[in-house]
């Protein structure tokens, strides 16, 4: 869990913002949402494979767009 130390004469709002930012970087909220409900292992694998396919298609489209601009 991210820990922040209050600086001298630091407003609470600024400290809260720093804490939220550190939680965001640590991925605590995303992890909590992911673990909120049980997900079957087959569903996890299926979602991971779909994400990999999406990344691959995105990479291919970027390469094709780059080739088109070169001509």
Swiss-Prot record:
One of its GO terms (biological process) is translation. GO terms for cellular component: ribonucleoprotein complex; ribosome. GO terms for molecular function: structural constituent of ribosome. It comes from the Bacteria. Keywords: Ribonucleoprotein, Ribosomal protein. InterPro entries: Ribosomal_bS21, Ribosomal_bS21_CS, Ribosomal_bS21_sf. PROSITE patterns: RIBOSOMAL_S21 (PS01181). Belongs to the bacterial ribosomal protein bS21 family. PANTHER family: MITOCHONDRIAL 28S RIBOSOMAL PROTEIN S21, SMALL RIBOSOMAL SUBUNIT PROTEIN BS21. NCBIfam families: S21p (TIGR00030). HAMAP family: Ribosomal_bS21 (MF_00358). This is Small ribosomal subunit protein bS21.
């Amino acid at each position: 869990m991210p820990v922040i130390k209050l600086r001298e004469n630091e407003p609470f709002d600024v400290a809260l913002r720093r804490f939220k930012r550190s939680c965001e970087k640590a991925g605590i909220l995303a992890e909590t949402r992911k673990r909120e409900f049980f997900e079957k292992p087959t569903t996890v694998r299926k979602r991971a494979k779909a994400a990999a396919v999406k990344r691959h298609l995105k990479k291919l489209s970027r390469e094709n767009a780059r080739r088109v601009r070169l001509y």
